[in-house]
A protein has these predicted regions:
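Short, small/polar residue-rich loop motifs at catalytic or cofactor-binding pockets
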Residues: 25-28, 90-92
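A short, hydrophobic, proline-anchored segment that marks a local hinge/packing element in signaling
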Residues: 91-101, 109
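Single conserved hydrophobic/aromatic residue that forms the stacking wall/gate
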Residues: 1-6, 10-11
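Gly/Pro-rich active-site capping loops and adjacent beta-alpha segments
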Residues: 104-158
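Gly/Pro-rich turn-and-neighbor structural signature
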Residues: 19, 27-79, 188
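Phosphate-interacting basic helix/loop segments used at nucleotide- and nucleic-acid interfaces
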Residues: 12-18
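N-terminal leader/propeptide and maturation segments of large enzyme subunits in energy/redox metabolism
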Residues: 135-188
């Protein structure tokens, strides 16, 4: 129950800090706590069921791309790769390892729809993935607590709403940070 409450509280923080109206007004988001094998331990009640399933797949792929023994406190991983667990390029997944006493104890992940990610926009006119918008493979958004400003600038400059897009990425990162803190508090 504590993990569920923690996930739900993070969702509320994400909705409160969201730049995208689709998050604030429609709840197009999900969040969850995962064990070290990428299995979901709890998910927020608020949110989109489709995001929950895709987010769960993304966490497993993040663990495969970035083995647990290479993760550090303050790391944040990001993708919008539909083949690695997002519905489409507008859905961003951020995953953060949670640490207690310098040991990784779980992962917190959240998914959210961003209003614009470049490209033609949402619709049937795209004939390949690149026409849909900026395609972000599994990357490290933060390394030991230091945000990758180059990646953030790249993301922002490839959208029609750079400020809102960057704000939503930071909001997702904060959601995970709060989730990890609440997980550790629960463990204490």
């Amino acid at each position: 129950d504590s993990c569920l409450v923690g996930s739900e509280m993070c969702i509320r923080d994400r909705v409160r800090t969201a730049f995208s109206p689709i998050v604030r007004e429609c709840g197009d988001i999900s969040a969850g706590v995962f064990d070290l094998e990428g299995r979901m331990m709890a998910q927020a009640v608020t949110g989109t069921p489709g995001h929950v399933n895709s987010m769960a797949e993304s966490v497993k792929h993040f663990i495969n791309h970035f083995p647990l023994n290479t993760m550090f406190e303050g790391d944040i991983f990001i993708t919008n790769d539909p083949w690695m667990g997002t519905g489409h390029l507008n859905d961003f997944v951020l995953t953060t390892p949670c640490f207690k006493d310098n040991k990784i104890v779980g992962l917190f992940s959240c998914t959210s729809h961003l209003t614009d990610i470049g490209g033609l926009g949402v619709g049937p006119d795209a004939t390949d993935i690149h026409m849909e918008g900026l395609y972000i493979p599994m990357l490290k958004l933060a390394d030991k607590g230091v945000m990758n400003k180059t990646l953030l600038k790249l993301i922002g400059q490839n959208t029609r709403q750079p400020v809102e897009t960057e704000g939503d990425v930071y909001s997702l990162a904060a959601c995970n940070d709060i989730g990890c803190k609440r997980l550790v508090e629960m463990m204490n």
